[in-house]
């Protein structure tokens, strides 16, 4: 079976990672002790992708928990599913990274990274045929961003032919912990562009807006934001965990979704949006779900898809529904909004259906879009970065850990290049080649 090794780094990474394991354990009928109590063969069919079967029929997550301070991991350990993880897979330091990317990437994190890689190796060796890695982390702090990207490049060195997938939480002033988030995020994106195959951009700005506007929560907590994240992560991994044809492994997903290697930043979406602990009073129809999931308000990245064009899209419908209706509705969306899909990639929208819906819903749909509008997110961070970097504000915290200003300049220009690449493909048309030909003839 094709296994995935999951790594969660830093406070945010460990919190959303822990929620992810709660949600998928529930979907696969696995209780907090790792015992199976399910009711469907589908739950066990591909259980080995994320779980190792230990002695006595216990299922243990292929998860590695990493942090530079013990706090968050202690709370994961004492949380609802804390006992399901392998005790040896908790790797933590004592110093903390103090929201400083340089500490996570070059100093504190670099000291801990080898002990993490030992655990990674151990997990990889127990796999029959490892397909790749997934990392949950944030880009705004010190450990998840700095040490997370360090882990990615080290794993990349050791397993160059395995897929590297990240769930990266992008910082926003609306839910901000630190003033240096734009620095940490820019330095991280600089790494992600080069070293990952697929990155789901989970944007705190969008999560906050969904909680505030759609779910009418006046003061959203991290718990509320993480509820949305776990629903989304459960949705985008459905194809990997349950039997099906489309995007059934990380590599197939990458082949379908990434037309150019640097443009691998996906915009996730989810419908129906519900708040924690609420029940759904009416089942939505397939047309309603389809219409909702393409709506900017349902995107987990604060970008308006109507400001760009989709290069590729994958949608995962969950629950009992007619395949025919799903296909009709998806075609309908494409026909009505054809200008928002690039015409030079035909059939760039793919759909999968899984019979098992998420807990508490009859039907749900998860959306993965590779849209050029994601440049809005990078522009937002870039503007905040430039405002501080122009005055060299807070730089001494980074140079004090041995970093050079040059590295900031490089990261900044790499992110600006990424924005221009998205813009270039947004403006590209199928007919362009011929135009160039004609112009050349006229000049001649």
Curated annotation (Swiss-Prot):
Q: Does the keyword Transmembrane apply?
A: no
Keyword set for this entry? Acetylation, Cytoplasm, Cytoskeleton, Disease variant, GTP-binding, Isopeptide bond, Magnesium, Metal-binding, Methylation, Microtubule, Nucleotide-binding, Phosphoprotein, Ubl conjugation
Q: Where does Mg(2+) bind?
A: 69
Q: Which positions in this protein are listed as binding GTP?
A: 11, 69, 138, 142-144, 204, 226
Q: Which Pfam families match?
A: Tubulin, Tubulin_C
Q: Which disease is it linked to?
A: Cortical dysplasia, complex, with other brain malformations 6: A disorder of aberrant neuronal migration and disturbed axonal guidance. Affected individuals have microcephaly, ataxia, and severe delayed psychomotor development. Brain imaging shows variable malformations of cortical development, including white matter streaks, dysmorphic basal ganglia, corpus callosum abnormalities, brainstem and cerebellar hypoplasia, cortical dysplasia, polymicrogyria. Skin creases, congenital symmetric circumferential, 1: An autosomal dominant disease characterized by multiple, symmetric, circumferential rings of folded skin, affecting primarily the limbs. Affected individuals also exhibit intellectual disability, cleft palate, and dysmorphic features.
What does the entry note on its domains?
A: The highly acidic C-terminal region may bind cations such as calcium. The MREI motif is common among all beta-tubulin isoforms and may be critical for tubulin autoregulation.
Region described as Disordered: spans on this chain:
423-444
Q: Which cofactor does it need?
A: Mg(2+)
Which species does this protein come from?
Homo sapiens (Human)
What name does the UniProt record give this protein? Tubulin beta chain
The gene name on file is TUBB
Q: In which tissues is it expressed?
A: Ubiquitously expressed with highest levels in spleen, thymus and immature brain.
Phosphoserine modification sites? 40, 172
Q: Which GO-annotated molecular functions does the record name?
A: GTP binding; GTPase activating protein binding; GTPase activity; metal ion binding; MHC class I protein binding; protein domain specific binding; protein-containing complex binding; structural constituent of cytoskeleton
Q: Where is this motif: MREI motif?
A: 1-4
């Amino acid at each position: 079976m094709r296994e995935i090794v999951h790594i969660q780094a830093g406070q945010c990474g460990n919190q959303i990672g822990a929620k992810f394991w709660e949600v998928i354990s529930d979907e696969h009928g696995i209780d907090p002790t790792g015992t199976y109590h399910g009711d469907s063969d589908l739950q066990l069919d591909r259980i080995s992708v994320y779980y190792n079967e230990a002695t006595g029929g216990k299922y243990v997550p292929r998860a590695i928990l990493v942090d530079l301070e013990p706090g968050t991991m202690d709370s994961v350990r004492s949380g609802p599913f804390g006992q399901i993880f392998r005790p040896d897979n908790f790797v933590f330091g004592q110093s903390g990274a103090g929201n400083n990317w340089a500490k996570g990437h070059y100093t504190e994190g670099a000291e801990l990274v080898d002990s993490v890689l030992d655990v990674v190796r151990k997990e990889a060796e127990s796999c029959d045929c490892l397909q790749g890695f997934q990392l949950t982390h944030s880009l705004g702090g010190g450990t998840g961003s700095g040490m997370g990207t360090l882990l990615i490049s080290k794993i990349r060195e050791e397993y160059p032919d395995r897929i590297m997938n990240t769930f990266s939480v992008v910082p926003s002033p609306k839910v901000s912990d630190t003033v240096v988030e734009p620095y940490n995020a820019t330095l991280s994106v600089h790494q992600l562009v080069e070293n990952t195959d697929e990155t789901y951009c989970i944007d705190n700005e969008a999560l906050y807006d969904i909680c505030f506007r759609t779910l009418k929560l006046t003061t959203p907590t991290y718990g509320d934001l993480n509820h949305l994240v776990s629903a989304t992560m459960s949705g985008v991994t459905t194809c990997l965990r349950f039997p099906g044809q489309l995007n059934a492994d990380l590599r197939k997903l990458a082949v379908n979704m990434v037309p150019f290697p640097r443009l691998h930043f996906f915009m996730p979406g989810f419908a129906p949006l519900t708040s924690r602990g609420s029940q759904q009073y009416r089942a939505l129809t397939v047309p309603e779900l389809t219409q909702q999931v393409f709506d900017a308000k349902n995107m987990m990245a604060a970008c308006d898809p109507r400001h760009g064009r989709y290069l590729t899209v994958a949608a995962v419908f969950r629950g009992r529904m007619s395949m025919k209706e799903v296909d009709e509705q998806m075609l309908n969306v494409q026909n009505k909004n054809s200008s928002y899909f690039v015409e030079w990639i035909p059939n760039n929208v793919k759909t999968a259906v899984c019979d098992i819906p998420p807990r508490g819903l009859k039907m749900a749909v998860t959306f993965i879009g590779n849209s050029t509008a994601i440049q809005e997110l990078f522009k937002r961070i870039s503007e905040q970065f430039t405002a501080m970097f122009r005055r060299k504000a807070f730089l001494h915290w980074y140079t004090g850990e041995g970093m050079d200003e040059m590295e900031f300049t490089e990261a900044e220009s790499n992110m600006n290049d990424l924005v221009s690449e998205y813009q270039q493909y947004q403006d590209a048309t199928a007919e362009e080649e011929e135009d160039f030909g004609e112009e050349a003839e006229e000049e001649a």
